[in-house]
């Protein structure tokens, strides 16, 4: 079973308070999501392998460490996942960015893939799937399916807010995928919204309704 990591860092929790607040406007909401994604990236990349290299400082030669050539891919789920990309790229500018687009079938209510564009070397790359909200878990699970069908083997899921129901779905369908969240909320309501949640992340990021 994949592990669930919930980040309790004070800076993250402080910023999530204002992400949740309905009075936070589009500009501030967008900046806060960017900042939280960047802070979460510190933890989600903690297991990146390192290697020793020789350098010369202004004082002497030294043996120090760099990331050992790991290929990373960020996969935002359209459209809300886009709001998390830049915050991570600030720390990992060499990461490649793909996209997965899904819509919900009005009859079956199941997510349907309509767009997938991935970086090269899929089988050799570590992927981080990005979505601010993990509600029912259907979209995240299907996005992970899309990656696996194309050869991806190392996948993590990163969300800002998650419902227990969504976590359970992803863990059951993808027991090999670890989930990283900034907040684990109480539940889903009868309409499938996370409670207390933060509303519709896509609408709040892009100023739409």
Swiss-Prot record:
UniProt record similarity statement: Belongs to the UPRTase family.
Pathway(s) this gene product operates in, as recorded in its UniProt entry: Pyrimidine metabolism; UMP biosynthesis via salvage pathway; UMP from uracil: step 1/1
Residues that hold uracil according to the record: 194, 199-201
One MF term in the entry's GO annotations: magnesium ion binding
Gene transcribed to yield this protein: upp
UniProt EC number: 2.4.2.9
Name the record gives this protein: Uracil phosphoribosyltransferase
Comment on bound cofactor: Binds 1 Mg(2+) ion per subunit. The magnesium is bound as Mg-PRPP.
Keywords assigned by UniProt, alphabetized: Allosteric enzyme, Glycosyltransferase, GTP-binding, Magnesium, Nucleotide-binding, Transferase
Activity modulation comment: Allosterically activated by GTP.
Physiological role: Catalyzes the conversion of uracil and 5-phospho-alpha-D-ribose 1-diphosphate (PRPP) to UMP and diphosphate.
Cofactor dependence: Mg(2+)
GO biological process, alphabetically ordered: UMP salvage; uracil salvage
GO cellular component: cytoplasm
Residues the entry annotates as binding 5-phospho-alpha-D-ribose 1-diphosphate: 79, 104, 131-139, 200
Catalyzed reactions: UMP + diphosphate = 5-phospho-alpha-D-ribose 1-diphosphate + uracil
